[in-house]
Amino acid sequence: MRCFRWWLYSGWWWLTFGCARTVTVGFVAPTVRAQSTVVRSEPAPPSETRRDNNDTSYFSSTSFHSSVSPATSVDRQFRRTTYDRWDGRRWLRTRYGNASACVTGTQWSTNFFFSQCEHYPSFVKLNGVQRWTPVRRPMGEVAYYGGCCMVGGGNRAYVILVSGYGTASYGNALRVDFGRGNCTAPKRTYPRRLELHDGRTDPSRCDPYQVYFYGLQCPEQLVITAHGGVGMRRCPTGSRPTPSRPHRHDLENELHGLCVDLLVCVLLLALLLLELVPMEAVRHPLLFWRRVALSPSTSKVDRAVKLCLRRMLGLPPPPSVAPPGEKKELPAQAALSPPLTTWSLPPFPSTRIPDSPPPPYQLRHATSLVTVPTLLLYTSSDIGDTASETTCVAHATYGEPPEPARSTATVQECTVLTAPNCGIVNNDGAVSEGQDHGDAVHHSLDVVSQCAADTGVVDTSE
């Protein structure tokens, strides 16, 4: 059961993340064709006033999803004008150095194109898992880093997709670290926090002099603060641009990536089916589905499915079920059953008809291991004139037809074997002395076999 759960969880994870649209060269280009900006930061010369190291390499910013009330923005605007009125430039120059050296200018473009992203591993996922606000409103979709790509006219850049800004049609605040030289992948691949958050912004991974922020919804969304940092604001109403149509090259790359994703999905679904479908259906599919089709149905849906299976396997349709009130007779059964008027009763057995004799029984040897049926041997003598003549009568459980005695001398030698007290019994009913019951049994069996061989068994019951 645990193995099945593990496979189920793994398949669900891959279907959620692995089958999502992977942001590669074909996916990034049509997604981020919105307003973009470039923030350039130049290192201060050594002769300038000493600045804080953290302030030279980081830009302060405000998160887009942190709700900024109008009162707060008015307060900030009032502070900024107050700083300008109190000679804020001099204060910035002494606190942070030259403000113009921190931010040299902004540049807007709507035609960014990436290439050669396939040479590096891509970790960017788009349209993966949606994020929701506490009031159940879509806040954005989870996205991760990308890889080193060629941006525009052949410059190397590390493409990073950060979740939390805008919708998927605008790239979710995509950031590109633009570098002058060769781009090197960072040591940590997945973000621990948002790239543009309350406080600081991570420096560029390729070159600390140029950082691109684009995928914004309007030019006013990214602003330069009085301290020389980068801030986020809400776009005014009606200033959001419409996303442009993708190019042909982008569609080809998108289809190529989609085929790979579909292949991965098919393989994962096959693994899940191997866990769910029994092995008998794989080893003997015809016998398995034949047995399923012939099994009784429990519902209408089950009956319809099994009817389709019967048609596919070439089996006859199931017999029609009669209503519970009616009871129909099959035609074959009706033909075999004659009407009641033609029946004739068989004659009753006569009591005078003698029973057939039992099958002949041959007495086995006394030393045989087979159990010999108990023999009941009786002797009787005629009363009166025939007192001297003695006949030997043997009654057995399986006897032979009675035959007349041949000689009286031989018959007189016969003795009686009684049960359960086995022994040699004389005419007066006493057991011979000097013999135990075991010897009496063996001796009597020998005598009986000799009598049967010489004279046969005499029946005097009549």
Curated annotation (Swiss-Prot):
<keyword id="KW-0472">Membrane</keyword>
<comment type="similarity">
    <text>Belongs to the HHV-5 US29 protein family.</text>
</comment>
<dbReference type="GO" id="GO:0033644">
    <property type="term" value="C:host cell membrane"/>
</dbReference>
<keyword id="KW-1043">Host membrane</keyword>
<keyword id="KW-1133">Transmembrane helix</keyword>
<feature type="transmembrane region" description="Helical">
    <location>
        <begin position="257"/>
        <end position="277"/>
    </location>
</feature>
<feature type="transmembrane region" description="Helical">
    <location>
        <begin position="12"/>
        <end position="32"/>
    </location>
</feature>
<protein>
    <recommendedName>
        <fullName>Uncharacterized protein US29</fullName>
    </recommendedName>
</protein>
<keyword id="KW-0812">Transmembrane</keyword>
<dbReference type="GO" id="GO:0016020">
    <property type="term" value="C:membrane"/>
</dbReference>
